[in-house]
Amino acid sequence: MLTQVPDAEPRLRCRRHAELLAAAILGVALARLLSTHAPIALAFACYGALHGAALALCLRPWPARWQAPAFVAAASIQSGLLARLGLLAAPLLARRGVEMAASLVVALCACAGALGYGALLRCLLRYRLAAGPLAMIALACVFAASAALVLMRQYPLGGTAWLAILWWLAFSGGLCADAGRRGLRAPAA
């Protein structure tokens, strides 16, 4: 019989995470088709909760009873607050042009979101993510969010879901790449 070691470092089950992320993406796409009008901060709070749940459910050993719900709630709050801050900051930066302001705000929020999310992973779920991989993930999230702005212009029906989905893919892809590198470095038992 297998027993859980209470202080064992959590491992991410990447295949399962990809499956849950795909289901969340389909759910978001369906929700966008059915209702395109939701306050941006609320939509992003929901996006944060969805990704947080998809991540917390894929850690082994399982997080303690309070850790996973606390992580999902914190991810939701962080995502909603960053969206709200972005909405407040955009008009202040719009003197240089709306498009430039939108690009800058989205890039800053994507980076801050990735760094904050990494801190939440470490603090609440005790998932070790070193500074180097986290910085690369944050950079990937900035590029993903910038690409999402282009998609939002080309395919407006997707709206803000483009930002969330591409950010999710960048962050989760980076996490899985880091988990794979860790697995290669781990000593064989």
Which residues fall in each region the model found?
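Juxtamembrane/disordered regions of integral membrane proteins
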Residues: L2-A189
